[in-house]
Amino acid sequence: MIKIRNLNQFYGGSHTLWDLDVDVPKGSRMCLMGRNGMGKTTMLKCLMGLIPTASGSISYDGGKELRGVAADKRAGMGIGYVPQGREIFSQLTVEENLRVGLEARGLKTAKKKELTDYVHSLFPVLKQMSQRRGGDLSGGQQQQLAIGRALTLEPKLLILDEPCEGIQPNIVADIGDLILRLNKDLGLTVLLVEQKLPFARRVASDFVILDKGRAVAKGAIGELTDEMVKQHLTV
């Protein structure tokens, strides 16, 4: 689904990604791991076209080169993205937040209703709170709204940057259940950054560890050893 080769990125005078090679197989649930400041979010932003890359290639869905494709065009290619901090529209209602994604696609009214109903089926609380402002929701509810909005794009690839950050444990469990369900039922490929090791072990099928902008370990999640955790993840 995603193939990154020899990717380099600079932030000011800092070399943040070094000849990075990462594969995200179609249908996988890939967890990008590493301590803070190691390049995980930077890699996701490169995937989404939010920051420039210096060299290398990013191919998607059978070989489509993403470098040079505008960020809004990448979303239209079937990539849903939920960034750190969720970035919902706090002054808009829940319904209006969902409508933003739907309107951008130019869909017919019946299709918009179908997708809204689908999101409500995944997150009943969003239907109950449809007229509440996004800023009035709890952190967990905002995360559900952000994921729901991304799903209105009907993505082939869903990218989640620390989906469990700052939210209550019961919603963390619900988000884990949802990732597994979407992957199993729809074949949705998921790429997530996650610091919580128990959540990663439960949800991911595969992992990549970044250390100072380099991929230093990768494999099936069952191959993530205690030694790797101690060397690359423990603070």
Residue spans for each PLM region:
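Conserved structural motif at the start of ABC-family nucleotide-binding domains
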Residues: I2, L17-D19
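The feature captures the beta-strand-to-loop junction immediately N-terminal to the Walker
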Residues: M33-R35
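Helix-to-loop junction immediately C-terminal to a conserved catalytic motif
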Residues: M48
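ABC ATPase NBD Q-loop/coupling interface
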Residues: S57-A75, K108, I221-E223
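Short coil-to-helix segment of the ABC ATPase nucleotide-binding domain corresponding to the Q-loop/switch region
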Residues: L92-V100, S130
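Conserved ABC ATPase signature
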Residues: R133-L137
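ABC ATPase C-loop
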Residues: A150-L151
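Conserved catalytic motifs of ABC-family nucleotide-binding domains
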Residues: E154
